[in-house]
Amino acid sequence: MSDKSYLKWPFFEQRHRALEGVLDAWAAEHVSQEHGRDVDEACRTLVRSLGASGWLAHAIGGIAYGGASDVIDTRTICLIRETLARYSGLADFAFAMQGLGSGAITLFGSEAHKQRYLARIVRGEAIAAFALSEPQAGSDVAAMQCAAVQDGDHYVLDGEKTWISNGGIADFYVVFARTGEAPGARGISAFIIDAGTPGFEIVERIDVIAPHPLARLKFTGCRVPASSRLGDAGQGFKVAMATLDVFRTSVAAAALGFARRALDEALERAMTRKMFGQTLADFQLTQAKLAQMATGLDAAALLTYRAAWQRDQGERVTKEAAMAKMTATETAQQIIDAAVQMFGGLGVVSEHPVERLYREIRALRIYEGATEVQQLIIAREILRNREPSGDAPTKA
């Protein structure tokens, strides 16, 4: 059983601790790492199950639309992702994409948008997607080429999106396109586009190291009502960054879940595997490795739940979320690699729990901003907040 002493930290309220306990019991009964080859159907099934059991109520903000509260509680999102990730990467993915795909609607949607989409998300009746990346514009959002030209009370979209999670199974997509109000990032707007809209097609399904629904999208003369725009024209970059600020911290939490499962597997292995007349755990080398794994996990968790707590206090957490995402994913990679090593040859057998975790975490170090992008964000934030002293160095 995983160490849950972190739940005693002051970042959490009693409601968070109670929720984690209920979810852990639910996941133990309803979530399996085995989902077969059809990840599309497995993902749909997980979304329906998460909706029917009430967990998707935490993915949106708005009690009027079925949400658990009027605002998205970041600590709750993080605890749910960490707990689900301990059991199944696909279950974590299914929950997370419902939140990320609809997050822009929670934050910037009109009343009509919220009425139409959020309640369906909560019930697990609709699947959401967040379409930002392009073939030539991943981390560099300002280089976006997909364009939306206004034509009366409609916009006409042309261009492509790629690496879109839930691509091919989503019922609607939050799509970002260049509308030209200003150069660079200030000339982007966000739109809600339903699957099946004429001029919108899925042109490629993408297979990746940790299987989940992923696709390349193409828009060719795709007409959408101007009323489908989220926020004001030219506000798309703000919409994207605000949404990512909420959910980037939760990526760190998913990494914690993977790492915690790996540590659990490693501890069990160390205590039961015998060689040279003693268990692995009796060797000082093994003890040192386990100590490093546990310490790294706690350090990453402290950064993650600090960022979540700060965001729930209404603070801007661009730097803190980047620190959490970078540290948790990189640390989890190290912990999982150490667990694989502890299992020896068994650790690289396909579908072994630690082999599966190894594939899951490698992708997470890239999704929603690679480690190198997080480093740039952190550096930009600390440089922005530092005033030059103005003192010239003295000569000896």
Residue ranges: model-predicted function:
Residues 127-149:
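A gly/ser-rich beta-alpha-beta helix-loop segment of oxidoreductase catalytic cores
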Residues 89-112, 138-141:
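N-terminal glycine-rich flavin-associated loop
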Residues 220-239:
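Long, acidic (Asp/Glu-rich), low-complexity accessory segments flanking structured domains
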Residues 1-86, 108-113, 120, 124, ...:
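Alpha-helical interface subdomain recognition
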Residues 154, 158-201:
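A short core secondary-structure module
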Residues 54, 81-85, 177, 193-197, ...:
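Short Ser/Thr-interspersed hydrophobic loop/turn segments at strand-loop and sheet-helix junctions
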Residues 143, 196-225:
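Flexible, small-/acidic-enriched active-site or ligand-binding loops
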Residues 94, 136-139, 163-166, 180-182, ...:
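Short Gly/Pro-enriched turn/cap motifs at secondary-structure boundaries
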